[in-house]
From Swiss-Prot:
Transmembrane segments: none annotated. It comes from the Eukaryota. Residues 366-410 form the FBD domain. It comes from Arabidopsis thaliana (Mouse-ear cress). Residues 10-56 form the F-box domain. SUPFAM superfamilies: F-box domain, RNI-like. PANTHER family: F-BOX/RNI SUPERFAMILY PROTEIN-RELATED, PROTEIN WITH RNI-LIKE_FBD-LIKE DOMAIN. This is FBD-associated F-box protein At5g18780.
Length: 441
């Protein structure tokens, strides 16, 4: 009995109540939902009861196909029935008739979930914000879109705002769009290289998650690009920015989780100016308890921040870091020295033959956290027989007085060749902590 009720010719899905069937159809594109109408007489008009349209311009052949389809749907169900609308298109800024025509039909609809996805990343759609629709929006997702200029705006119900390569009319418009959303909780911005915003202000009393991505190298802005974050309830902050001249964090939750992949760009700046910018940024996140930091950011900070006394993250309890395995013996003790109360460390070691090995740090630095707080270390990348990696493991085992667990992974590609020797060397390493459990995966 697969898909059919025993003793009858009716399949299991068809006997489900219509509200549940409509909910299932809501996860399909409208084109696929319409195709189910040929299954039986019961399915013929079922797709019309799905309060969501997911359209793709490539599915139509006429000049204004999407708008005509929307008209027919609204005439059948009524303007107040539609709750979700998504349009996939491939048009550029010079051919926006499809988008404009669809938006005109949605003017009086109480849309809660609205999404525009431009299939061609190099093309940009010009999009106006429709004021009546804004009052009911809960989720707004735009991809490769130029926002038209707007004045006062209100998004009283908006909780989710995801912008992929969206171009704002001005600095002020970006600030207003965020500030006029009093219940916003999830904000993701991936800025376009054509965006002229120079000061991005993220001010929200309700925001809990903020992701910023800015990795293009050619930007039209001529001034210093900075980010100002004033989000007292923020619980997750993900920064991936390779062109920033500065961050200013006014407020965020003390329990915030921070993911840092940042490289500061100071055009014509001195080494001291770079250090000052880095110190300002580190001061902004000095009270976080959980941090993930990329290899790029770690190398950049380590290279430019040769200050004494070194900056301290007194509240940091969990750290996940990526670094070159060749330079890890020199870098790791220095990084750990900045985290005197660290309890959990996760490492990803990346091998690069162009990076020279460093060992002096291991011989001279004994960070405080190794003596007083570090309880677990998880090395996510497979351990090989390279001297630096084995020395790193020995260093942690021999100097961590409070270590309770060390998790290692063997290199699967060379397990047969190196496993016996690796295990023997690791197991024979002296352990400072008698409670340390060695886990080999």
């Amino acid at each position: 009995m697969q898909g059919r009720v025993r003793g009858s010719g009716e399949d299991r899905i068809s006997i489900l109540p219509e509200p549940l069937l409509c909910h299932i159809l809501s996860f399909l594109r409208t084109k696929d939902s319409v195709r189910t109408s040929v299954l039986s007489s019961r399915w013929r008009d079922l797709w019309l009861w799905v309060p969501r349209l997911d359209l793709d311009k490539s599915d139509f052949s006429d000049d204004n196909p999407s708008a005509s389809f929307v008209d027919k749907f609204l005439n059948f169900r009524g303007e107040s029935y539609l709750r979700g609308f998504k349009l996939n298109t491939d048009h550029d800024v010079y051919d926006i008739s499809t988008l404009d025509a669809c938006l005109m039909r949605l003017d009086k609809c109480k849309i809660q979930h609205f999404e525009i996805e431009n299939c061609f990343g190099f093309c940009i759609l010009l999009m106006p914000l429709i004021i009546p629709m804004c009052h009911t929006l809960v989720s707004l997702k735009l991809s490769f879109v130029i926002l038209s200029k707007f004045g006062s705006l209100s998004l009283p119900c908006l909780e989710i705002m995801h912008f992929e390569k969206v171009i704002f009319p001005s600095d002020k418009s970006a600030e207003v769009l965020i500030a006029c959303s009093p219940v916003l909780r999830d904000l993701r911005i991936s800025q376009s290289g054509d965006d002229a915003v120079e000061v991005l202000r993220v001010c929200s009393a309700s925001l809990k998650s903020f992701t910023l991505k800015r990795t293009d190298h050619d930007y039209v802005g001529n001034g210093e690009y900075t980010v100002v974050i004033d989000t007292p309830r923020l619980e997750y902050l993900n920064l991936k920015d390779y062109q920033c001249q500065g961050f200013k964090i006014v407020s965020m939750s003390e329990y915030v989780r921070v993911h840092v992949d940042v490289v500061f760009e100071v055009i014509g700046g001195t080494v001291l100016s770079k250090r000052n910018i880095i110190c300002d940024f580190l001061s902004c996140v000095s009270n976080v308890r959980y941090m993930t930091i990329s290899r790029r950011s770690l190398e950049f900070i380590y290279r430019h921040l040769e200050l004494k006394p070194r900056f301290k993250f007194h509240d940091l309890a969990r750290l996940r870091a990526t670094m070159f395995s060749n330079s890890s013996p020199e870098m790791l003790p220095v990084i750990l020295e900045t985290c005197p109360n660290l309890k959990h460390l996760t490492l990803e070691l990346v091998h690069d033959s162009l990076v020279t090995e460093g060992t002096s740090g291991l011989l001279t630095v004994l960070p405080r956290c190794l003596i007083s707080s570090l309880a677990s270390v998880d090395i996510e990348s497979p351990i090989t027989d390279k001297a630096t990696e084995l020395k790193l493991v020995s260093y942690l085992l021999e100097n961590s007085t409070t270590l309770k667990k060390l998790v290692l992974r063997l290199n699967q590609s060379c397990r047969d060749k190196y496993e016996p020797g690796l295990l023997k060397q690791v197991l024979q390493s002296p352990r400072c902590s008698s409670l340390c459990q060695l886990v080999i995966l």
